[in-house]
């Protein structure tokens, strides 16, 4: 929830979700 994964999720889901990232405020975060 606090580490940005350097990916946005405005139009498409987080590709980095496979690494444990999730969408938050249109940006992909981890932990």
Curated annotation (Swiss-Prot):
Domain of life assignment: Eukaryota
Keywords from the UniProt entry: Disulfide bond, Plant defense
Post-translational modification: This is a cyclic peptide.
PROSITE patterns named in the record: CYCLOTIDE, CYCLOTIDE_BRACELET
InterPro entries, A to Z: Cyclotide, Cyclotide_bracelet_CS, Cyclotide_sf
Any one Gene Ontology BP term: defense response
Matches recorded under Pfam families: Cyclotide
Disulphide-bridged cysteine pairs: 5-21, 9-23, 14-28
Per UniProt, location of the Cyclopeptide (Gly-Asn) cross-link in this chain: 1-31
Protein function: Probably participates in a plant defense mechanism.
Family to which this protein belongs: Belongs to the cyclotide family. Bracelet subfamily.
Domain notes: The presence of a 'disulfide through disulfide knot' structurally defines this protein as a knottin.
UniProt-recorded name of the protein: Cyclotide mden-L
Organism, scientific name: Melicytus dentatus (Tree violet)
Lineage of source species: Eukaryota, Viridiplantae, Streptophyta, Embryophyta, Tracheophyta
């Amino acid at each position: 929830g606090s580490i940005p994964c350097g990916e946005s999720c405005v139009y498409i889901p987080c590709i980095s979700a496979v690494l444990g990232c999730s969408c938050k405020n249109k940006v992909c975060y981890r932990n």
